[in-house]
């Protein structure tokens, strides 16, 4: 992986918003998920830097991006406002945009509200809502993993009371992390260790938890005009094929790709498939 360059700029309200720039070629703006996590977990985005100039945003309150003064300022409209300021900072009339997980929800909101600003859109392991169908699929995926040695602790972590401090939240998040993989073994545990020490922003997670029950973007998706790729892992326990199918049906002309033997961390579980599918779509 080439050396990356950490860059930043001042937002209209005086915060520093930072991003990592690496690679060469057409610009691909990447909004990671979490929320509240830095994009360190995405690594080099499956080597897409070999084909594109990656602009990997540190969302507000993560990495080298300042936290807003208001601890509640982590709503989707807040994130899309930052994304628009990033586009303006880059001096681009249109952007190719990849949103991953929570970042995929941000990307949907942005592309639906500003369709003229998005040239191509990649929605990776994300969803338009977490309704009954999605919740049922998640529960089935959790039960499918019940025989794993890590299951008891990971499942318990998801049922405990909400922790208070950022460190407690990070501990809970990492205990539950094995669910994000189709297979969780020593290699996956070693990968988690590479970013286990990254700070986590509990405020962002708390706001997201409040928004989830009412999240439903289906009525907005017809406004998206950019060619769109919807990609997820076959074994993704939270944003899997059920979520992908709903997105694909609602976004005009969207293309769907389901990656076998991959969960929510498809970008690191099946990097070659992820790279090839995304690169082929963006250059087609």
Language-model regions, residue ranges each:
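Active-site loop/oxyanion-hole signature of alpha/beta-hydrolase fold enzymes
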Residues: 59-102, 276
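Short beta-strand/loop motif that positions the catalytic acidic residue
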Residues: 224, 230-232
